[in-house]
Structure formats: C-alpha cells, structure tokens
Amino acid sequence: MMKKLSILCLTVLLTAITANAQMRKVTNMDAGWRFHLGNVENSEKTSFNDAGWRLLNVPHDWSIEGENLRDNPGGGSIGFFPTGLGWYRKMFDVKSFDSRKRYSIEFDGIYMNSTVWLNGHELGTWPYGYSSFSYDLTPYLKQKGNVLAVRVDNSQQTNSRWYSGSGIYRHVRLVETAATHFAKWGVFNSTLTLNDNEAVVRVKSDVENEEVGNRRLTLRHEVVDAMGVCVAKTEKVVSLKASETTADEQTLAVTHPHVWNLEHPYLYTLRSTLLDGKRIVDVVENTLGIRTIEYPLDKGFLLNGKQVKMKGVNLHHDGGAVGAAVPERVWERRLEILKSGGCNAIRTAHNPPAPEFLDLCDRMGFLVMDEAFDQWINGKNKQDYHLYYREWHERDLSAMVKRDRNHPSVVMWSIGNEIRDQRSEEGPGAAAEMIAICHRLDDTRLVTSGNDEIASNSPTSPEFLAAFENDIIGYNYPDRWRTRREVLYAIDKTNYPNRRVVATESTGLGGPRRQYQWPGTMPPPQLGAGADGFSPQQQLPPRFRRRNRGLISSEMIDVEHRWRFTTAYDYVIGDFMWTGIDYYGESGWPSRGSQSGYLDNCGFKKDSYWFFKSIWSDEPVLHLLPHWNWEGHEGQIMQVACFTNCTDVELFVNGKSYGKKSTEFPRRGVNPSWASYDPGKHFATTADLHLTWDVEYQPGEIKVVAVRDSVTVEEVIRTAGAPAQMRATVDRPSFRAVPSDVAHVTIEVLDKDGNLCPLADNLVRFNVKGGRLLGVENGNMTDLGSVLASERKAWSGKCMAIVAADKPGPVTVTAEADGIQTASITFTATIDKPQRTPKKTK
C-alpha cells in the first residue's frame, strides 16, 4: 500500500508540474545591494545615482564594522558600537514578469525603523527590528529596471538593552505567485494524536483569491519523508470567493511514523498544493515534525508522552565577530557545542530569532521558548519598543507566531521579559490580549513571560499573573528573593496548585574565560561572579565589575540548589540559565559586552561549561581547574576544583595524592519525602556538585583520576613554559562555498612541549588564501580592536578567525606571531555537503 501511495504521489506531482504555468517562484535577493552610511536626500528615487555607494550583499550589519567608542550614542547597552542611519538600494529585473501574477518582497529582519520604496513609491514602514514582514510589489513592478530602496534608521538611541546591530541583517526574497495563492505563513500543521502505529496530522490553510471572480480549486496536502517518499496524502475541492481569504482544515494519517524528539529529530516535509485540474496554481512546503507536547500540572513537560526536563540557556542574537548578520554555520557550531554539553532548550532572549536559527533547532533537537518583546506599554529606554507597542504589537506578535508555528522545536511562546507593566494598571489587560492572540493563531502551545518581580518588595500584580494561570508562569531569578532562595516555587505551588512553573531566567556561572586571581583560596571567576583580579575590569564602574566572593559563592550555591530542586520536583518544567554564550552589549566601558555565558563569544568553553555538562549530561565529565602557571606563588596554599559526574575522584599534585572525594546527588532531603533515594555505595565527601582540594602550589602537574561505570578516566594540567609555537585547528575539513557556511579556525599558543600557554596574549596575524576573512575574536570583551582586522591578540592562549569562500578550492589560513613558530592549516571549500570531522595541524 505504501509503495502504491508513493508512486501515486510522484505521478500526480510530475503530471502537475508538466502542466504547470503559474507555480510559485522564490528568488533570493541577498546579492548586489548598494549601501551608504548616512542620510542622502532623494535616495528613494529611481533616478538617484548610487554609483559611488559601496557594493555589498545582505545580510549586512554596519554596526559591527565601526569603532567601539565611549561616546557612541547607544552606550554600554549595545557595547559602545556605532549605530546611525543608512540606505540600501538594489536594481533588479523580473524576466518572467506577468501582470496577472502577484509579487511581494520579504524581509526576515531589518534593524530598525525601516522604510521601503519600489520605483519611487513608498511601500511602508516597519519599526520593530526583529519582525519578519513583506510588502506587495505588484502595483509598481515592471519587467526591467526596478529599483528597491530601503532606509534604515537606528539613530534614535538608546532603543535596546543589548547589541542589536544595524541594517538589513537578515535575508531578503522576491516571491512570485498566481493571483490565487496560499497566504503568507498560511499553512499550519500540528500533530493531533500519536502512537507507534499512526499519527494524525492536522493541516489548517488560508488561501487568498485575488481574482475578480470566484474559483473552485483542488487543495492537496502530502506528507513527504526524509527520503523524498510521499507517505500520506489528502485533497478536496474548495470554493474560493473573489477578493477573499478562505480557511480550510484537513487531516492526514501517517502510519508507523518517525517521531521528532531530542535524540532523533526526524523531519518530514508537508507539501501543500493548489490545482486547477492538473495545472498547479501554487505550492508551498513546510517542515513537519511529528510530535506531541503537553504540560500536565504535576509532570512539568511531556514530549511524546515522556517527561523531559528543560535544561535551558538564554541566548541573545549576535554571532560574535560577525555581529547581527550571522551565517547559519556560526549558529550551527554554537548549537553543536551547547548540545554536547547537555543543553536541550533555548530561550530566544528577548526577541524573535532568525528563521534559520529555528531551522537548526528543528534539525538538531532543541526545545525553544520563542520570545516576542522586551517592552510593552512602559519602556526601559527612551527610544525602545514602548513607543510603538500600542500600534504595532498585534502585527509583530502575529508575525512571530504565524512564521514560527510550524517549527517542532518551538514548544512555548513568551510574550515578554521583565515587563515594566507587571505592576501597571494596563499590564493584565495587555497580557490577556496577547495570550489570546497566541491561542487564536496557534491552539497547540502555551504562553509565558519572564517575570522578575513575583516576590519582590514591589511585586508583580496578582491580576497580571492571573492572565497566565491557564498557561505558564515564568520566573526570572527565583533564587534572589531572600526567604525564597531555599523554597523557590514551592510556596506558590502550594497556594496555586494549578500553576505551571518554569524558570525563564536564572543565575548562571559566567565570568572571563580561564581568568583567575590569586590568592588560590579565591576561586576561578566562573565559580563565583568573576574576578576583580582581571586587571582590565578594574577600570569598569562598580555595577559592571565581576567580583570574586569565594568558591562557595552565592552563585555556585544558588545554581546547585536550584538544579537539585528542579530535578526533584516533577512539576517544574525546567530552568533557563543566563546565558549560554557571551554577547555584545549590556556592559560598562571599556567592555564591549557581557561575559555571563558558559561559552565565550568565540564558542570557546569556559570552566562553567563543564560544570553544567556534569549535571546535564550522561557522558563522563571530568574537568580540572585552574591552570597551573602561578609563578611567584610557589609553596603557597591554593584551591583546586573539579567538575565531574564520576565517582571517587582522586587528585594528584606532582604524583602526590591529596585523597579521593565524591559528590552526592541528589542531596538528602531535597526529594518530596526525606531521603527517598538510594544514596549509592560510595561515601560522599560533599553535598555540593563540585569538588575542591586545598594544595600547596608547585610547578609541574596536577591530575585527577576518576571512575565512571567501571571505566577509569583522567585529566591532566601541566605548567606551561614560554610560548614557542602555535596550533591551528578548523571545525571541519571542508565547508561549502556559499554565504551561509563558514569555517572556524582556532589558534592556540603552546610551549615547546605542546602545552597550552594559559597566560599568552601574543598578537596573532592572519593570512587567508583561497577564501575571505570574515572576522576575528578572542573572547576578551575589553579588547577593543576591530573584529574585521586581520590580527587579534590571543587571550588565555587562544583566538579565532572566521573564514568564508566564494568559490570551491583549497583554503589556507596562516597565523603568525613575533618570536614563535608560525601555524598553517589547509582545508577545502566545496559545493558538496561538508565533512564533519575536525581537522588539526600536526
């Protein structure tokens, strides 16, 4: 039967394509734009001469190209990057132009206050910089000599609390359809029922008939598997009234379905077709992940009927050295590293992400809290979204929900973050209205927001929280509310047993990567809140300094306790820590950004990455810190720490044992009934989720040896000598010569024996042959050198270059530094699917 269905689907498709005359056509419009930074009168006019403007491709972010200056209007909120006003112009022809068709231009995101013209005619303005939107070009389009002009105004500062970027920083498309066509984002799929034998998929669709007369067309939906085989099909004849949008609903049964889950995120394609007889009128394809989501009051979150704890991180949208115009591979690599650390959930703080980000989450198996706004009626900055909320929030929220509702990775909507209207008279009504919008457009997901004042001295109003009582209450920093540090959500769950609970934002363990201060009894910054001993940060205002308060710091205690609580109580949906990755903005001079992530903005792992992996992952974890280069402190006592999920960890310093230690998890008494677990056979020396030893510092070697599932594992750190050489590695041996793909080349400064030099800050100069250098970074937010330069200092012994290619062939990256051996690596740019195995220099 399946073979017959597949042949039938293929036969019908081929027949229809043969008879087709009006199929949808989507053209990428990223290439060949002219750009000018600054305002020029009459730039929207067709006759304007833009020959002197810069030629570039979008996505493009002009802020990342500028200099970080203390007096830049956006200030520390956006990392002291420049903003301003810019113009883009593009000339294009439409060879297949047909006056009977409909044409639109789609922008995935322009930051911000963009106005668009076609051939001198103003199409409209869109203030919000994170929305995807489109304009109808049909009335003004011609076959040849079209001019598209876009004015982008990011000059009104401050309008963001984090780095926004400036410009057409996401993709652009030209869409050509027949006059009768599927509405934009007009097909919505969801899984109604699911078992091993069958999944029932519901498809809702909106069809626009812009003809002058009524029409009767066949509306067909097909489910196509990953091999291209049609596995389910349904169709019916629909009557379409002239100049109206018609809604339709159908269901399909998929037998023996492959489910979408975190381990095997299987994706089907839903192909939706409008036919006039055998002639295709329109076709759209959408991702289909067959999965069910539930939020039972006592079990938190169920994916396909199985309980899953959300091990989440908050992420801002910049991509480090590439700014806001992020090639897809940059996010793919970052998500690969997060996934390897046990992370399974992302909160898109605090705006809708790029569409391709969600495509990656679909393919890689992440759960996403898709967030809309950082402000509503009352603002946080003079020029932020509160100026536009009343007029624009319904359009912006609807755009997010309709655009993203076919992504199986998206499992809940968030309508706000730390909204000032938590206590205002208008807040409850605004929340209720937006929740209703979400439910009207998507009846499969619940809604939350990040509330940071639930138990504060000026608490969130009961009426505001009541708006979410049938959905999910999001808690920002629940561990900071004094008496609630221990009980967290328990008081509210007792008082409101029907409340669903998620930690939308909570304390993380950030700090500068591998930067420590002496004395050794003070911990590495990632264990506490950072280190005043990191000398550049001593220049920061007190608000932005990262203070080091001891290994058993409040941050470490909070994180460990919060995770125990989260795992012990089934009703807690999960925890989203702040943040997964360092980001530009929200900083004080001379810092460009926040170092709150457990990855820096190169994607390099901090110590805290290994802490979270030790509690989130089932893979053996054994991580030792700090580094072992403490010249001048020989014979003094310092602290050594270990993050692990192994048992019986033993520390050796230059061969001398400092004894075995073990963690105990969960701690006795954190379960709903006291000690309702088997504590295991080993003797726990601590109830914390990390281990420490006080040792005498002597140069040489520190080593930890541990046992995991009867397998012995170890980690060694050695005292490094003077920098003598460099090692170059690339994330993959090959990558595609397309704009969405890049290669990440990591440079490590080593001593003569190959040990990483943890204090090295050599200036590294890059030369690229066969490709283009897109950007350089090192993770040091106080390094104010341009990320578009061809050189970068190493920081904690490492730096990175991001490389692109315009054509297939070998790409060679050479790194040079004064006084040490040069490193070089060659890899391949190809038009084929890239290899996944990392490549290193010998």
List each model region and its residues.
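Non-catalytic, glycine-rich low-complexity segments
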Residues: 23-40, 52-95, 108, 112, ...
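Extended acidic/polar, glycine-enriched regions
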Residues: 142-143, 206-296, 693-699, 708-709, ...
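Accessory beta-strand-rich segments of carbohydrate-active enzymes
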Residues: 29, 37-39, 78, 83-185, ...
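Substrate-binding/catalytic cleft of secreted carbohydrate-active enzymes
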Residues: 278, 335-338, 344-608, 612, ...
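Active-site-adjacent substrate/metal-binding segments within catalytic domains
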Residues: 60-107, 111-119, 124-127, 175, ...
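Catalytic cores of secreted or luminal carbohydrate-active enzymes
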Residues: 161-183, 574-635, 639-725, 755-757
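Beta-strand-rich structural segments
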Residues: 203-207, 638-644, 705, 740-758, ...
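Short flexible loop/turn segments that cap and initiate beta-strands
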Residues: 46-48, 214-220, 261-269, 645, ...
